[in-house]
Protein backbone atom coordinates (compact mmCIF):
# COMPACT_ATOMS: atom_id res chain seq x y z
CA UNK A 1 0.00 0.00 0.00
CA UNK A 2 2.87 2.34 0.87
CA UNK A 3 4.58 1.63 -2.47
CA UNK A 4 1.33 2.37 -4.31
CA UNK A 5 1.07 5.71 -2.51
CA UNK A 6 4.63 6.64 -3.51
CA UNK A 7 3.97 5.73 -7.16
CA UNK A 8 0.81 7.83 -7.10
CA UNK A 9 2.80 10.75 -5.67
CA UNK A 10 5.32 10.51 -8.50
CA UNK A 11 2.49 10.34 -11.04
CA UNK A 12 0.76 13.38 -9.55
CA UNK A 13 3.97 15.39 -9.60
CA UNK A 14 4.42 14.40 -13.24
CA UNK A 15 0.96 15.37 -14.48
CA UNK A 16 -0.29 18.06 -12.08
CA UNK A 17 1.88 20.71 -13.74
CA UNK A 18 0.67 20.03 -17.29
CA UNK A 19 1.42 23.00 -19.51
CA UNK A 20 4.22 24.32 -17.32
CA UNK A 21 7.83 24.53 -18.47
CA UNK A 22 9.15 21.97 -15.99
CA UNK A 23 7.83 19.53 -13.43
CA UNK A 24 9.62 19.64 -10.08
CA UNK A 25 9.78 16.15 -8.62
CA UNK A 26 11.22 16.15 -5.07
CA UNK A 27 14.29 14.00 -4.48
CA UNK A 28 12.57 12.30 -1.52
CA UNK A 29 9.63 11.18 -3.68
CA UNK A 30 11.87 9.79 -6.41
CA UNK A 31 14.17 7.93 -4.03
CA UNK A 32 11.23 6.43 -2.13
CA UNK A 33 9.73 5.14 -5.38
CA UNK A 34 12.88 3.31 -6.50
CA UNK A 35 15.17 2.59 -3.54
CA UNK A 36 13.57 -0.70 -2.45
CA UNK A 37 14.05 -2.32 -5.87
CA UNK A 38 17.57 -0.90 -6.13
CA UNK A 39 18.58 -2.19 -2.68
CA UNK A 40 17.36 -5.71 -3.45
CA UNK A 41 19.33 -5.91 -6.71
CA UNK A 42 22.37 -4.15 -5.30
CA UNK A 43 22.64 -6.38 -2.24
CA UNK A 44 22.40 -9.45 -4.44
CA UNK A 45 25.11 -8.12 -6.78
CA UNK A 46 27.57 -7.46 -3.97
CA UNK A 47 26.68 -10.77 -2.33
CA UNK A 48 27.80 -12.44 -5.54
CA UNK A 49 30.88 -10.16 -5.59
CA UNK A 50 29.81 -8.63 -8.91
CA UNK A 51 31.18 -5.17 -8.14
CA UNK A 52 30.84 -3.93 -11.71
CA UNK A 53 27.12 -4.78 -11.85
CA UNK A 54 26.63 -3.15 -8.45
CA UNK A 55 28.18 0.05 -9.78
CA UNK A 56 26.00 -0.18 -12.89
CA UNK A 57 22.88 -0.41 -10.71
CA UNK A 58 23.91 2.69 -8.75
CA UNK A 59 24.60 4.69 -11.93
CA UNK A 60 21.29 3.55 -13.38
CA UNK A 61 19.36 4.63 -10.28
CA UNK A 62 21.04 8.03 -10.27
CA UNK A 63 20.89 8.81 -13.99
CA UNK A 64 17.44 7.38 -14.73
CA UNK A 65 15.52 8.35 -11.60
CA UNK A 66 17.32 10.94 -9.45
CA UNK A 67 19.09 13.38 -11.77
CA UNK A 68 16.65 16.17 -12.59
CA UNK A 69 14.78 15.93 -9.28
CA UNK A 70 14.89 18.73 -6.72
CA UNK A 71 16.43 18.45 -3.28
CA UNK A 72 13.94 18.83 -0.45
CA UNK A 73 14.43 21.65 1.98
CA UNK A 74 15.84 20.74 5.39
CA UNK A 75 17.58 22.38 8.33
CA UNK A 76 21.35 22.25 8.90
CA UNK A 77 23.31 23.43 11.91
CA UNK A 78 26.62 25.31 11.65
CA UNK A 79 29.22 24.90 14.38
CA UNK A 80 28.44 28.48 15.42
CA UNK A 81 25.36 30.55 14.69
CA UNK A 82 21.73 29.91 13.83
CA UNK A 83 20.39 26.91 11.88
CA UNK A 84 20.38 27.28 8.08
CA UNK A 85 17.73 26.09 5.63
CA UNK A 86 19.13 24.28 2.60
CA UNK A 87 17.03 26.49 0.31
CA UNK A 88 18.87 29.57 1.64
CA UNK A 89 22.06 28.62 -0.23
CA UNK A 90 22.12 30.74 -3.38
CA UNK A 91 24.98 29.39 -5.51
CA UNK A 92 25.28 26.00 -7.23
CA UNK A 93 26.08 23.44 -4.54
CA UNK A 94 28.76 20.78 -4.21
CA UNK A 95 27.34 18.78 -1.29
CA UNK A 96 29.34 16.08 0.50
CA UNK A 97 27.62 13.96 3.14
CA UNK A 98 30.09 12.69 5.70
CA UNK A 99 30.74 11.52 9.25
CA UNK A 100 33.77 12.24 11.40
CA UNK A 101 34.42 8.52 11.89
CA UNK A 102 34.97 8.14 8.11
CA UNK A 103 38.71 8.10 7.42
CA UNK A 104 39.54 10.21 4.33
CA UNK A 105 42.30 9.25 1.93
CA UNK A 106 45.57 11.02 2.67
CA UNK A 107 45.22 13.34 -0.32
CA UNK A 108 41.44 13.81 -0.15
CA UNK A 109 41.21 16.94 1.99
CA UNK A 110 44.20 18.71 0.35
CA UNK A 111 42.58 18.12 -3.06
CA UNK A 112 39.15 19.25 -1.84
CA UNK A 113 40.56 22.36 -0.17
CA UNK A 114 42.44 23.36 -3.34
CA UNK A 115 39.22 23.17 -5.36
CA UNK A 116 37.26 25.05 -2.69
CA UNK A 117 39.82 27.86 -2.59
CA UNK A 118 39.73 28.18 -6.40
CA UNK A 119 35.98 27.97 -7.03
CA UNK A 120 34.20 29.17 -3.87
CA UNK A 121 33.15 32.38 -5.63
CA UNK A 122 31.03 30.33 -8.05
CA UNK A 123 30.09 27.28 -5.99
CA UNK A 124 28.97 26.66 -2.40
CA UNK A 125 30.99 23.73 -1.07
CA UNK A 126 28.93 22.15 1.71
CA UNK A 127 30.15 19.32 3.93
CA UNK A 128 27.23 17.86 5.88
CA UNK A 129 28.17 15.68 8.84
CA UNK A 130 25.96 13.12 10.56
CA UNK A 131 27.53 13.90 13.90
CA UNK A 132 27.64 16.15 16.94
CA UNK A 133 29.14 19.67 16.98
CA UNK A 134 31.79 18.50 19.43
CA UNK A 135 33.07 15.93 16.94
CA UNK A 136 33.01 18.40 14.02
CA UNK A 137 35.09 20.91 15.97
CA UNK A 138 37.87 18.32 16.04
CA UNK A 139 38.10 18.23 12.22
CA UNK A 140 37.10 21.84 11.44
CA UNK A 141 40.68 23.03 11.01
CA UNK A 142 41.31 20.36 8.35
CA UNK A 143 38.97 22.16 5.94
CA UNK A 144 39.35 25.37 3.96
CA UNK A 145 37.91 28.49 5.60
CA UNK A 146 35.71 28.82 2.50
CA UNK A 147 34.00 25.46 3.11
CA UNK A 148 30.53 25.43 4.69
CA UNK A 149 30.55 22.86 7.49
CA UNK A 150 27.17 21.77 8.87
CA UNK A 151 25.90 18.94 11.01
CA UNK A 152 22.57 17.20 11.40
CA UNK A 153 21.45 15.62 14.65
CA UNK A 154 18.81 13.03 13.76
CA UNK A 155 17.50 13.03 17.32
CA UNK A 156 16.35 16.65 17.15
CA UNK A 157 15.98 17.43 13.42
CA UNK A 158 12.40 17.89 12.27
CA UNK A 159 13.20 16.98 8.66
CA UNK A 160 13.70 13.32 9.53
CA UNK A 161 12.30 12.01 6.24
CA UNK A 162 14.78 13.71 3.91
CA UNK A 163 17.63 13.17 6.40
CA UNK A 164 16.95 9.43 6.38
CA UNK A 165 16.97 9.46 2.58
CA UNK A 166 20.31 11.26 2.39
CA UNK A 167 21.98 9.16 5.06
CA UNK A 168 20.45 5.71 4.88
CA UNK A 169 19.18 5.28 1.30
CA UNK A 170 22.39 5.97 -0.62
CA UNK A 171 24.90 5.90 2.21
CA UNK A 172 27.93 8.12 2.76
CA UNK A 173 30.35 9.63 2.05
CA UNK A 174 28.50 10.77 -1.07
CA UNK A 175 28.77 13.78 -3.41
CA UNK A 176 25.70 15.62 -4.75
CA UNK A 177 25.88 18.31 -7.46
CA UNK A 178 23.00 20.79 -7.54
CA UNK A 179 22.32 23.98 -9.49
CA UNK A 180 21.18 27.14 -7.73
CA UNK A 181 17.54 25.99 -7.97
CA UNK A 182 18.51 22.83 -6.01
CA UNK A 183 18.06 20.65 -9.11
CA UNK A 184 20.22 17.51 -8.98
CA UNK A 185 22.80 17.39 -11.76
CA UNK A 186 24.61 14.30 -10.51
CA UNK A 187 25.47 12.05 -7.58
CA UNK A 188 28.78 10.24 -7.11
CA UNK A 189 30.25 8.01 -4.43
CA UNK A 190 33.36 9.43 -2.80
CA UNK A 191 36.32 7.65 -4.37
CA UNK A 192 38.40 5.35 -2.19
CA UNK A 193 41.80 3.70 -2.60
CA UNK A 194 44.22 1.42 -0.80
CA UNK A 195 45.86 2.92 2.28
CA UNK A 196 49.31 2.22 0.83
CA UNK A 197 48.96 4.96 -1.81
CA UNK A 198 51.48 7.78 -1.54
CA UNK A 199 50.29 11.29 -0.71
CA UNK A 200 50.97 12.40 -4.29
CA UNK A 201 48.98 9.54 -5.83
CA UNK A 202 46.19 9.96 -3.30
CA UNK A 203 45.97 13.68 -4.07
CA UNK A 204 45.76 13.04 -7.82
CA UNK A 205 43.12 10.32 -7.42
CA UNK A 206 40.89 12.55 -5.29
CA UNK A 207 41.54 15.71 -7.30
CA UNK A 208 40.47 14.01 -10.52
CA UNK A 209 37.35 12.60 -8.87
CA UNK A 210 36.33 15.85 -7.16
CA UNK A 211 37.09 17.86 -10.30
CA UNK A 212 34.36 15.94 -12.10
CA UNK A 213 31.75 17.50 -9.82
CA UNK A 214 33.23 20.96 -10.19
CA UNK A 215 33.25 20.56 -13.99
CA UNK A 216 29.59 19.50 -13.94
CA UNK A 217 28.59 22.61 -11.99
CA UNK A 218 30.76 25.00 -14.03
CA UNK A 219 29.50 23.53 -17.32
CA UNK A 220 25.92 24.03 -16.15
CA UNK A 221 26.68 27.65 -15.27
CA UNK A 222 28.14 28.17 -18.75
CA UNK A 223 25.05 26.58 -20.30
CA UNK A 224 22.75 28.87 -18.34
CA UNK A 225 24.80 31.86 -19.48
CA UNK A 226 24.52 30.79 -23.12
CA UNK A 227 20.78 30.24 -22.82
CA UNK A 228 20.36 33.75 -21.44
CA UNK A 229 22.22 35.14 -24.44
CA UNK A 230 20.22 33.09 -26.92
CA UNK A 231 16.99 34.36 -25.39
CA UNK A 232 17.84 37.84 -26.63
CA UNK A 233 16.10 38.23 -29.99
CA UNK A 234 18.68 40.35 -31.83
CA UNK A 235 22.26 40.23 -30.64
CA UNK A 236 24.76 42.83 -31.90
CA UNK A 237 27.54 41.41 -34.07
CA UNK A 238 30.17 41.86 -31.36
CA UNK A 239 27.92 40.09 -28.86
CA UNK A 240 27.55 37.14 -31.24
CA UNK A 241 31.32 36.90 -31.60
CA UNK A 242 31.78 37.06 -27.84
CA UNK A 243 29.21 34.30 -27.38
CA UNK A 244 31.20 32.00 -29.66
CA UNK A 245 34.38 32.45 -27.64
CA UNK A 246 35.43 30.05 -24.96
CA UNK A 247 34.34 31.82 -21.77
CA UNK A 248 36.10 29.41 -19.42
CA UNK A 249 39.02 30.44 -17.27
CA UNK A 250 42.33 28.60 -17.66
CA UNK A 251 41.59 26.64 -14.48
CA UNK A 252 38.10 25.66 -15.64
CA UNK A 253 39.49 24.60 -19.02
CA UNK A 254 42.18 22.49 -17.33
CA UNK A 255 39.62 20.71 -15.16
CA UNK A 256 37.46 19.99 -18.20
CA UNK A 257 40.46 18.56 -20.03
CA UNK A 258 41.33 16.35 -17.04
CA UNK A 259 37.76 15.11 -16.95
CA UNK A 260 37.85 14.27 -20.67
CA UNK A 261 41.06 12.30 -20.08
CA UNK A 262 39.35 10.50 -17.20
CA UNK A 263 36.40 9.54 -19.43
CA UNK A 264 38.71 8.29 -22.19
CA UNK A 265 40.69 6.20 -19.72
CA UNK A 266 37.48 4.81 -18.24
CA UNK A 267 36.32 3.80 -21.72
CA UNK A 268 39.66 2.12 -22.44
CA UNK A 269 39.48 0.23 -19.14
CA UNK A 270 35.92 -0.86 -19.96
CA UNK A 271 37.02 -2.19 -23.36
CA UNK A 272 39.92 -4.07 -21.76
CA UNK A 273 37.60 -5.67 -19.22
CA UNK A 274 35.18 -6.70 -21.97
CA UNK A 275 38.01 -8.28 -23.98
CA UNK A 276 39.32 -10.06 -20.91
CA UNK A 277 35.87 -11.49 -20.22
CA UNK A 278 35.50 -12.57 -23.85
CA UNK A 279 38.88 -14.33 -23.76
CA UNK A 280 37.97 -16.04 -20.50
CA UNK A 281 34.69 -17.30 -21.96
CA UNK A 282 36.51 -18.72 -24.98
Predicted regions span which residues?
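Short active-site neighborhood of thiol/selenol oxidoreductases, capturing the structured segment around
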Residues: 84-106, 110-112
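N-terminal "domain-start" segment that seeds a small globular fold
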Residues: 47-84
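Thiol-/selenol-based redox modules, centered on thioredoxin-like
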Residues: 172-251
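Long, low-complexity, compositionally biased polyampholytic IDRs enriched for Lys/Glu and Gln/Arg
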Residues: 247-277
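Bacterial Sec-dependent N-terminal signal peptides
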Residues: 1-25
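Short, internal strand/loop/helix patches
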Residues: 143-180
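Structural microenvironment flanking redox-active thiols in thiol-disulfide oxidoreductases
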Residues: 107-145, 156-163
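Short N-terminal segments immediately surrounding and downstream of signal-peptide cleavage
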Residues: 21-38
Amino acid sequence: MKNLFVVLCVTLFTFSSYGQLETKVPFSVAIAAHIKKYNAKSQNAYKEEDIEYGEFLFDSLVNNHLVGTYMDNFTMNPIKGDPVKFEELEKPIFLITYATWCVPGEGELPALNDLIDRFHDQIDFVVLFWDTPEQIKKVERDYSNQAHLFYVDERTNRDTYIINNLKHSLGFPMMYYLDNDKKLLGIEKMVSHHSSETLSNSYNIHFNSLSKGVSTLIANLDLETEEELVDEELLPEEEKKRKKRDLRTDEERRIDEEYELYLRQKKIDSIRKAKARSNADN
